[in-house]
Amino acid sequence: MRSGYLYALGAFGLWGVLPIYWQLIREVPALQVVCHRIIWSVLLLVPLLSWTGQWPVAMAAIGNPATMIRQVAASIFLAINWLAFVWAVSNGRMIESSLGYYINPLLNVLLGVLLLGERLRHGQTIAILLAATGVGWLSWHVGTVPWIAIALASSFCLYGLAKKTTSVPPLVSLWIEATVLLFPAIVYLTGQHLQGKGAFGVHGLRIDGMLLASGIVTSVPLWCFANAAQKLPLSTLGILQYLGPTLQFLLGWWVYKEPFDATRMIGFFLVWTALSIFAWDLVHQGSPARFSTTNDPPASDGNQGPLVGTPKAASELEQ
């Protein structure tokens, strides 16, 4: 059990501090960062699949049309989530991105009601109404809809829904999704370089090295989460998942000095209160994980595993 906590803290802690990594390469346009992340993730996962002996599983998944339809849909939501997160971090919207990951579990529950016919418990109803009030407050008083938070939460949610009925292991799933995006990523980066707009080889060895390592920072938290998911109860993971957005929030507020006035504080307080009620309901009711599949943890960035109230595929997505 102790090792499970260490793996969970490693996964959620890394996801929480990954904004620092993307901030260090903010000179690179967000779409180019995402394309590099796709390419180097594919190349890193190839030997990992060989090492873990999962190529037969990968080939079986590719040969299953129903599985591939879901994987292609998931890859689209994965790309949207990665792009929104990297753009937010690079443009001083880290606090808003943390809001997206805070409200994501509640959005999963709401989608379960709307699309899957699930029933809300009283605690869940109160939590969703409070969170919606918080988001509405921020939209009204700040003057703009927090579209980054909504984009991150909804892409996370739809990613989990796309993978709801699949049982593809996490490394295989991430490799397939990244491979689906590989050709568009290569075409886009090639076009950017031909137009003289490519970032690789332009900003120095540090930036180039960090782009190359983007596959590692994508895969390591996923590996940690996959181990944690095998060793800890889902309710424990459901609580620990909030470490990631909390670290993101603290980075944005304390380290990067993003604006957080009294108006924003009220909106976040409503959301945090909603999450406290949601967590209490989760612990006392022992609710099963939403959108979970037998073997597939949530995805990062870029954006978190088979969590109660979160898509199991979140670990590939976050940051």
Model-derived features: where do they sit?
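Hydrophobic alpha-helical transmembrane segments of multi-pass membrane transport proteins
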Residues: 9, 13-17, 21, 72-89, ...
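Structural motif at transmembrane-helix junctions in multi-pass transporters
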Residues: 27-32, 83-100, 223-240, 259
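Helix-helix packing/entry segments at the starts of transmembrane helices
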Residues: 99-103, 170-180, 219-254
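Membrane-interface interhelical linkers
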Residues: 1-10, 43-73, 122, 174, ...
